[in-house]
Amino acid sequence: MKHHAPARRRGFTLVELIVTLVLFGLMGATLVVFLRPAVDSWLAVRTRAALASDADHALRRMLRDVRAAVPNSIRTPNTQCFELVPTGGGGRYRMAADGVTAGSAPADPQVATTQFDVFSNLQPLPAVGDWVVVDNQNPGDVYSGTNRSAITALATPAAAHGRHRLSIDALQFPLGYEGGRFTWVPDSQKAVFYACSGASATLDGNGDAPGVLVRLKDYGFNATAPTSCPAVNGADVLATGVRSCRFLYNANQGATQQSGFVSLQIELTRNNETASLVLGAHVSNVP
């Protein structure tokens, strides 16, 4: 009877192991050399895209308020902030009594007005406590309240008289104003300030800029024109990582001087990547 010796099991020799480790090391080093720049580039592009998106969102949010603002209500203490009075809507009011149907409610500039008919379909509707503004020729008027009055009631008049009837605290409409237009301002926000706070090119340990862009609302109407940017405690934050801001406003752009021009610039920095956007728009200053 023959006995067969078990087959010898063969493994890695020390030389083979060393060669394998060396080859894997070379492959790993090669992958790092070629892949790391590609990965870093992808991460940088993603960061810049996010910065551009955040900057665009913040600028368009400001521009939406600028375009909807009460005419001539923009005030700029400096290039780091600006104030305005955004509206919720507006329309045309009745300027004379209906000569056929009795019971209309015109706004008579000769006496104080407490109610008037509205020809336009207001969407959305203002609420009791919101503010009616008429003929804002000067920036200080809407803030001081000379052409602004609180809404006390809303009603639907006869169809021949208009779409809506607004009751307001007694207000004498400006003499000589023939536009027949009004705007209304939500009492929930009143005047609004946009401000850059803490913007600086000095970055923190993560490569982020320290500034923030904020929207401050519902602080009331200040008759005195601001000379500096306000404190931003409790304000809504629109953007972080702000490196710099620059807000410029020309109230009398063009030959007719009926429209202004606003330029909004913001620069954001995060993870040592920077995106800078500029947006400009014409501003209607015709009440």
Residue ranges and their predicted role:
Residues 8, 17, 78:
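Exposed loop/turn and edge beta-strand positions of beta-sandwich/beta-sheet ligand-binding modules
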Residues 29, 87, 267:
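Acidic/polar N-terminal loop/beta-strand segments that form early-domain functional surfaces
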Residues 198-287:
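Short linear sequence signals and composition-biased patches located at protein termini or domain-edge surfaces
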